[in-house]
Amino acid sequence: MSLRYESIESLSQMIQNKTIRPSELIEDTFVNIEKDDTVINSFLALDKEAALEKAKTMDNETPSGKLFGIPMGIKDNIVTKDVETTCASKILEGFNSVYDATVMNKLNAENGILVGKLNMDEFAMGGSTENSFYKKTVNPFDHKAVPGGSSGGSAAAVAASLVPFSLGSDTGGSIRQPASYCGVVGMKPTYGRVSRFGLVAFASSLDQIGPITRNVKDNATVLEVISGLDPHDSTSAPVDNVDFTSQIDKDIKGLRVAVPKEYLGEGVSEEVKASVQAAIKALEKMGATVEEVSLPNSKYGVATYYILSSSEASANLARFDGIRYGYQAEGAQNLEELYKKTRQEGFGDEVKRRIMLGTYALSSGYYDAYYKKAQKVRTLIKQDFERVFENYDIIVGPTAPTTAFDIGAQINDPLTMYANDILTIPINLAGLPSMSIPCGESNGRPIGLQLIGKPFDEKTLYNVAYNYEQIFNMHERYQSL
């Protein structure tokens, strides 16, 4: 009996009822990974021995915790004490953290079992997972297509039913865009909802960790586990933990839905428009009221994001110098040369591009023209959302302007690649919660519906997503892959 297509809820019930043992589930997981991941390439490292040992110990224990015996994959920019963390970069090859990230501690406290670390764009910079130093991940729905990025391995592993859930990180769309491309459920929580302690920083004012699953309720369960105030993270918000799964199925009659006209305009493919408009009509049939609104400053989102995120990245990545950990270049004659050679050889092209862009934006004479101006535009984008949320409960639109593109099609065209995140970036700039759920397909490649909520109102997003999932879900499609 293959357990790969079962939900977290179903697997937990089976373990509780002693229909299966945790060790059987973990053994089945590794059988599937070893059989299928030679093609998908979602995992960078596996922790088979430790996972099986932990599962066998659990066989003799009374089930406790929301994730007892459940296998999980973690994006490789979230540090794990016992498994290498590389951020898919040569410069961190062989790096082993001396501690677990807060989210890992929370997952372990609920008795989840880590099976491995997942591929990504190097240092989370990219939208296709082609920027990984180690391997290229493919889209389980179409092996010629990218899985999205930067959390491409996290989305692909879940879509291929190798694990029931994974964690990704989202700085400008890096959970939601791959979730859209791979036909899975991806949540970027409100900034501060989930601790970033142990997440290797890209852009600290934008980064947020979130779950990727095959159904909405599983996603809510995982967010419940990883949420909460953390004294190790000064940006962690002092808000009460929420039971996201309770009343997840309540009806949405009277829900006020806003649809930004900019999100269905130029650049959005006809197939994506049609699927998203059909999903919006479905919400209307369920009793929601839908009105068009405007988010006029969203068009400046991509430019604003690349100035701010690259500026923060140039500072955050200064610590990788070949001295303390990771890759160290050979043949340097002095300290300055060691720094230069290590960073030149250790970082990939996209990371270098963003470091240079960020350093330029922060440099004397350009700071006011670029960085300071971008901060002002960020405020305007945030105010646009605040105005809309005075009268509406949720904003709905596409997650990405198109379906997944072919591997190799955009890797040499950074501006086109950057534009793929035009619909997700503004939400990070505003610090809001947002999720992608499947709403259609075009030529076998999935289309995602993006739901955007008020600060710390992930519960409403899950409620709407769950109701929509009852009329459109991908369960049978996962089994056909």
From Swiss-Prot:
InterPro entries: Amidase, Amidase_CS, Amidase_dom, AS_sf, GatA. GO terms for molecular function: ATP binding; glutaminyl-tRNA synthase (glutamine-hydrolyzing) activity. It comes from the Bacteria. Its EC number is 6.3.5.7. GO terms for cellular component: glutamyl-tRNA(Gln) amidotransferase complex. Pfam families: Amidase (PF01425). The active site is at residues 75, 150, 174. Keywords: ATP-binding, Ligase, Nucleotide-binding, Protein biosynthesis. It catalyses: L-glutamyl-tRNA(Gln) + L-glutamine + ATP + H2O = L-glutaminyl-tRNA(Gln) + L-glutamate + ADP + phosphate + H(+). Disulfide bonds: none annotated. GO terms for biological process: translation. Heterotrimer of A, B and C subunits. Allows the formation of correctly charged Gln-tRNA(Gln) through the transamidation of misacylated Glu-tRNA(Gln) in organisms which lack glutaminyl-tRNA synthetase. The reaction takes place in the presence of glutamine and ATP through an activated gamma-phospho-Glu-tRNA(Gln). Belongs to the amidase family. GatA subfamily. This is Glutamyl-tRNA(Gln) amidotransferase subunit A. It comes from Macrococcus caseolyticus (strain JCSC5402) (Macrococcoides caseolyticum). The lineage of its organism: Bacteria, Bacillati, Bacillota, Bacilli, Bacillales. The gene is gatA.
